[in-house]
Amino acid sequence: MVMRAKKVFVVVAYDVSDDRRRSHVVKILEKVGVRINYSVFECLLTDVQFEKLQNNILGKIKPREDTVVYYPICVDCYTKIVYQPDSRRKYEKVSVV
């Protein structure tokens, strides 16, 4: 029996003032998530991936100038997400961390 790591659905929003730093943040997020708006990504991550994502982004931003916010979404709230228009990818399974 193969055990799979539980995953958490996370919405990541950022405000990065410098084009170069912002480009680095976008490249990191594009590897693990889906862009749903100019500065917002949805990600389905294990705990290890989530921690790594935060560390990778922290290494690319200037905390006094930039902001990145991570919103973990519980299963109950995830099922209530509304997209207008409904064209976004829905993840198959979401687990609470």
Predicted features and spans:
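Basic nucleic-acid-binding interfaces
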Residues: V2-V11, S17-V97
